[in-house]
């Protein structure tokens, strides 16, 4: 695993420029994102499904790095974004056995950009709570103050970005 220490200093466009100019390898951003998730998520609880193998396979299939975000890792919100052969739980244990047979339009568009879906972010049950504290997974913590939770249906995404 190759960790790109300055990963957090760049946005997606900046990372794409580094990849295209061969200053970093296409695998560096993904390895760095995985490292951050593994180090920070036990404390934050913002990623409820890790899809590292899928992301690596997507990168291997896109050797030509096609798409404006080719090689850039991302989290997919686990709410109304179906991902083929994976559950879409929407923060609920009720849907734990609901495997989606297809990528929905939004997921297909993300894939077309070349982005690598490396996980699904935490959401409150069905997006109906003002904080991200689903019974199934437990609360998502604010990275700036872990005594607090994150709010809204994008709490997992918000915590991941803020971390």
Residue ranges of each PLM-predicted region?
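Gly/Ser-rich catalytic/binding loops embedded in alpha/beta enzyme cores
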Residues: 2-163
